[in-house]
């Protein structure tokens, strides 16, 4: 049975109460009741993002986010979308430097469906992953890069700024979208190895918030996720340390056919978790 503890908001604060649990396979589960509306939200957060990618395989975390919607052993094709939307829910996924997450918002009585769907693809997506899915989503992601970065005014500005702010070899040197060359180079076996390493219960946090019965919800989580094996092969991410001061101004001028001039600037702020960082957050 899962073990857990409760974190309670201070009396009179108006805050919510959350309980945290951990399954035997390492999956962390956070539950929070909010009965204002008959809706429940599920978010499955995997501790893998673009900072965990290796040189020559940038964009793999984001590509795999797309592959997660291509069908699993029991829910083929677009079945995940169709089942959630057919039940009156909504869904999506996002990828960042640090993490990848998947989420559904469902009518309360359809919560079990969302939990089963997330557990199904965590546990059985590998069996359905094939070359057709890989090529399909590779093209989708490459087209997304063209639409959002390569073929729009100022589209590559943030990508250039990131590469300038973080030196070669730093895990933040590239953005989650990845390069065209690396997207072309990614193989089906790369995707399978990525899944085996990172899409494991001991590398994830499942949160369920809304009009829920915590005891019943936890029972469903144990029922659907409890038998998925953990995986201990994940390598630690590359060192993300940087000196406190850059020591110089780093500048790049780009000349392109765009409607007007634009300036994008970034500043090195104090380390996260310090009083100075908190002050900077308030100031900015």
What are these regions (language model features)?
Residues 275-284:
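Short, intrinsically disordered, charge-balanced linker/junction segments flanking boundaries
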Residues 48-58:
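Short pre-active-site segment immediately N-terminal to the catalytic Zn-binding motif
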Residues 69-73, 125, 213-215, 225-231:
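Bacterial peptidoglycan biogenesis and beta-lactam-recognition machinery
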Residues 2-50, 74-110, 148-203, 227-273:
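Non-catalytic beta-strand/loop surface segments
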Residues 131, 138, 188, 192-224:
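Non-catalytic, conformational "gating/processing" segments within enzyme and secreted inhibitor domains
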Residues 70-71, 105-137:
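M16/insulysin-pitrilysin zinc metalloprotease superfamily fold
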Residues 125-145, 213, 232-248:
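Acidic/histidine-enriched alpha-helical segments
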Residues 58-72:
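Active-site SXXK
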């Amino acid at each position: 049975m899962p073990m857990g503890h409760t974190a309670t908001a201070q009396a009179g604060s108006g805050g919510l109460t959350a309980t945290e649990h951990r399954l035997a396979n390492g999956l962390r589960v956070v539950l929070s009741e909010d009965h204002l509306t008959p809706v429940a939200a599920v978010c499955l957060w995997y501790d893998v993002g673009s900072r965990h990618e290796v040189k020559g395989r940038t964009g793999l975390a984001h590509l795999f986010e797309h592959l997660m919607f291509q069908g699993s052993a029991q829910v083929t094709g677009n079945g995940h979308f169709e089942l959630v939307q057919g039940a009156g829910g909504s869904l999506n996924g996002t990828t960042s430097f640090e993490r990848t997450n998947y989420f559904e918002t469902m009518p309360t009585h359809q919560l079990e469906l969302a939990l089963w769907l997330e557990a199904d693809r965590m546990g059985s997506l590998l069996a359905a992953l094939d070359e057709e899915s890989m090529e399909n989503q590779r093209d989708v992601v490459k087209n997304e890069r063209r639409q959002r970065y390569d073929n729009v005014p100022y589209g590559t500005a943030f990508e250039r700024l990131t590469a300038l702010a973080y030196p070669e070899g730093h895990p933040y040197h590239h953005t989650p979208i990845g390069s065209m060359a690396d997207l072309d180079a990614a193989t089906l076996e790369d995707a399978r190895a990525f899944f085996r390493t990172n899409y494991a219960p001991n590398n994830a946090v499942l949160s369920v918030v809304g009009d829920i019965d915590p005891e019943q919800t936890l029972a469903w989580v144990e029922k659907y996720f409890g038998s998925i094996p953990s995986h201990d092969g994940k390598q630690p991410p590359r060192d993300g340390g940087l000196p406190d001061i850059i020591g110089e101004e780093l500048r790049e001028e780009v000349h392109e056919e765009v409607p007007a001039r634009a300036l994008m600037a970034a500043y090195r702020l104090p380390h996260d978790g310090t009083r100075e960082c908190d002050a900077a957050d308030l100031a900015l």
